[in-house]
Regions:
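Conserved inter-motif catalytic segment of the P-loop NTP-binding fold
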Residues: 92-195
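Flexible glycine-/small-residue-rich
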Residues: 67, 101, 151, 182, ...
Length: 307
């Protein structure tokens, strides 16, 4: 360009080379669409939620899972940690996962239950020789060996681990999923300085987006709920403030509606505002069986407050 030509002598050859490396890559919209298709997605093992998400949890994006305690956020994360390892012959990613646990919620026995159920399912549906061969190595031991667990006791440890993560990902190219359960806990419990917390969260959000796009992995973060007063009434909203709400590409709200557990997609660039029923079983995150005459398993969100 003219600017580069003008300053060539001042920059020198080495400086010019570095500058050119930093220039943005120009791609067409069609190329971007093709890249997204190639990235793939991770099944949630809920066909209704997968359908609402246009195929499952997107790779290369940041997804936030919000909800009150006990509604199933961690259970969905554990399910995804197993599902990301589904063999390629079944349409899976055959990847590995990094699970950053800030609350001590990772329970090995529960992971074992979910893994055993997934292995049983694919053993039953395996048809051709390639799929049957894949099941020879897709077992409990291989699933557990592909989960890298990182226990973070405070926000300093969490930020430090994320700082080291790019080097780890270069050494482990099969990692396709990063889970942080939860991102809210260390910041809300241990950091009272709101100004500092906001700056750190902004930096963290940028870092997660960079990790997702540069390393082509799905980033899943869980968030707690807090109370906000609006029109003299209190409402439950995702924690960490409105600025944090821009961190994710997709936001899924898990909530109770009476006796029903509902997963609502409240933010997404491509999915309609939809809610589907789910429940947590001994085998993991699953659909709720719909009545036989039900042709519409998804529940339109007719009223939705801005989250």
């Amino acid at each position: 360009s003219a600017i580069i030509s003008l300053h060539r002598n001042k920059l020198g050859e080495r400086g010019l080379h570095l500058l050119q490396r930093q220039r943005g890559e120009a791609v067409t919209a069609l190329e971007l669409l093709q890249r997204e298709k190639e990235c793939g997605s991770i099944t949630t093992f809920s066909s209704q939620l997968d359908r609402a998400l246009k195929g499952g949890l997107p790779v290369g994006k940041v997804t936030e899972i919000c909800g009150a305690p006990g509604v199933g956020k961690t259970q969905l994360c554990l399910q995804l940690s197993v599902d990301v390892q589904v063999p390629l012959s079944f349409g899976g990613l055959e990847g590995q996962v990094i699970f950053m646990d800030t609350e001590g919620s990772f329970v090995l026995q529960r992971v074992g239950d979910v893994a055993a159920a997934v292995v049983r399912h694919f053993s039953l549906v395996a048809e051709d020789g390639e799929q049957k061969d894949a099941m020879q190595t897709f077992d409990m031991e291989s699933i557990l060996s592909n989960i890298f667990l990182v226990r973070c006791h405070d926000y300093v440890e969490l930020l430090a681990e994320l700082h080291l993560l790019p080097d780890f990902l270069r050494d482990q190219p099969r990692v396709r999923l990063l889970v942080i359960d939860s991102v809210a806990f260390p910041f809300r419990q241990q950091l009272d300085d709101l100004s500092l917390r906001t700056r750190l969260l902004q930096g963290l959000a940028q870092q997660l987006v960079s990790i997702a796009t540069r390393h082509n992995i799905a980033v899943v973060i869980t968030n707690q709920m807090t109370t906000r007063l609006q029109d003299s009434q209190s409402h439950l909203v995702p924690a960490l403030g409105e600025i944090w709400g821009h961190a994710s590409t997709t936001r899924i709200l898990l909530q109770w509606e009476g006796s029903r557990q509902v997963a609502a997609i409240v933010k997404s660039p491509c999915c309609m505002d939809t809610a589907v029923q789910y429940h947590i079983t001994s085998e993991g995150f699953r659909d709720v069986n719909q009545p036989e005459n039900s042709d519409q398993p998804e529940i339109p969100l007719t009223e939705r407050r801005s989250l």
